[in-house]
From Swiss-Prot:
Pfam families linked to this entry: DUF179 (PF02622)
Region Disordered: start-end pairs: 1-20
Name the record gives this protein: UPF0301 protein RPC_0788
Cellular component GO terms held in the UniProt record: cytosol
Family: Belongs to the UPF0301 (AlgH) family.
Domain of life: Bacteria
Organism from which the protein derives: Rhodopseudomonas palustris (strain BisB18)
Alphabetized InterPro entries for the sequence: AlgH-like
Amino acid sequence: MDPKSKAPKRDETKGADDASGRRYLDGQLLIAMPVMEDERFARSVIYVCAHSSEGAMGIIVNRPAGSIDFPELLVQLEIIDKADQIKLPENAETMKVLKGGPVETGRGFVLHSSDFFIKDATLPIDEGICLTATVDILRAIARGAGPKHAILALGYAGWAPGQLETEIQGNGWLHCPADADLIFGGDIEAKYSRALHKIGIEPGMLSNEAGHA
């Protein structure tokens, strides 16, 4: 991982091969293999938001932030007053806050269902899944006008050009199609085993051999 990598622009040919035959993985899940040397990404599941010749950007979807919940974050950002925490809609009260990765950890990225869209701010990634990184979506969620499904990630994971491909070739990651139910639903810490089960693998079966489904 390159913690200084900037998020690349999303290539409009999502999932397509480039001229050199490389396949871009935006809209897919990365599942860390046991040989992952970087402890920050051990047993991580990452949703790839952008992947092109410029590099890659993704959000870790199974790492709770722990130190703050969504209502507290809204107060810190002065979107609501402290007294208004008890008046939030249920989906705002229970919205998950995650450690999205080591890059720009002070910035929020909302992965959400496609029933919410802000012109020039929302990036459609795959069918039913979008990314918005402006405070407007937090305001919408706070007043009950946001997307039906959403998670907030602080920071993201970034790769320099060709770096993700090298890590996959080095047995660092499995990759498979994304699952909206896995991204938005269920216990956060169970997502690693759920992602493996999705491609027919028991966690104990993992070895040093990488591949994809």
